[in-house]
């Protein structure tokens, strides 16, 4: 008959085994989503999710109350696998798309997305803004497992990566649910990332999504070619600054913005009027203006 010492050791081994089995079961549950119940509106109801987060706009922090053009954009993204967005500066398109990713990351276990930006500074800034959105949600069930400007992971939920579009990036794309190329017209590696992503996305079928958004950067680049392409399955969306109510209600907004930024007529046509021809001679660096 085993003595007390042996029983104690046996009990410790049994407890350790029990802990391991629980950990494995938790991993399986997270991977499969079994038993998961979304506490927030899903992507199809993004217009209800957005106001749960707070954003910085016009120098203040307040709940994200999306405009109709932003609601229409997310609705079209939900309904299409491939979306390309031509936009003016300062229309909040990048933050809107990332809010959609945040919604999916919090409501779909195993969800993953990658957002590629022009530089590490750009990707870090976007990651910081979306991390702030996530942190602003008043719900104790949201638990970060990784919280940085390049990766946002939630326990039992999804992950969003924010990465610079370097030449090496195309070779390291993980299997993701959504791939976003922010300011795609300005990404030197856009075509290689796009090409590398297609086989990865094909494993997820119709659930995978590819989103490109940008202001124009002349003709001949991948973004311009896709935008001007034929009826090839791309969902083409255009967001002009005049569709943003806070700008539209001020008849002098365009004039004041142009003068404040000291823009030439050519730069204005590119950055705000979405003119591809004018942007062939770009003189206004995109990183100087908030997307």
Predicted regions and their residues:
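Phosphate/NTP-binding elements of NTP-utilizing enzymes
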Residues: 2-291
């Amino acid at each position: 008959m085993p003595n007390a010492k042996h029983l104690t050791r046996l009990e410790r081994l049994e407890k350790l085994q029990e802990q391991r089995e629980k950990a494995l079961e938790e991993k399986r549950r997270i991977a499969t989503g079994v038993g998961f119940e979304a506490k927030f509106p899903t992507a199809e109801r993004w217009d209800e999710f957005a106001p749960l987060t707070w954003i910085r706009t016009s120098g203040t922090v307040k709940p994200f109350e999306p405009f109709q053009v932003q609601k229409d954009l997310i609705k079209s993204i939900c309904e299409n696998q491939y979306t390309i967005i031509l936009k003016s500066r300062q229309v909040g398109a990048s933050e809107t798309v990332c809010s959609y990713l945040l919604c999916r990351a919090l409501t779909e276990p195993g969800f993953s997305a990658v957002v590629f930006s022009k530089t590490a500074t750009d990707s870090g800034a976007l990651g910081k803004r979306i991390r702030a959105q996530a942190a602003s949600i008043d719900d104790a069930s949201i638990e970060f497992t990784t919280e940085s400007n390049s990766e946002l992971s939630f326990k039992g939920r999804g992950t969003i990566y924010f990465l610079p579009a370097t030449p090496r990036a195309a070779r390291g794309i993980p299997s993701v649910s959504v791939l976003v190329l922010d300011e795609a017209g300005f990404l030197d590696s856009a075509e290689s990332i796009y090409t590398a992503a297609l086989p990865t996305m094909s494993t997820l079928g119709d659930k995978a999504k590819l989103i490109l958004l940008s202001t124009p950067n002349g003709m001949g680049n991948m973004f311009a070619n896709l935008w001007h392409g034929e009826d090839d399955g791309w969902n083409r969306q255009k967001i002009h600054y005049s569709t943003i109510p806070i700008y539209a209600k001020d008849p002098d907004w365009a004039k004041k913005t142009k003068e404040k930024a000291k823009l030439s007529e050519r730069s204005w046509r590119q950055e705000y009027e979405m003119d591809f021809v004018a942007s062939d001679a770009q003189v206004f660096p995109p990183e100087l203006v908030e997307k």
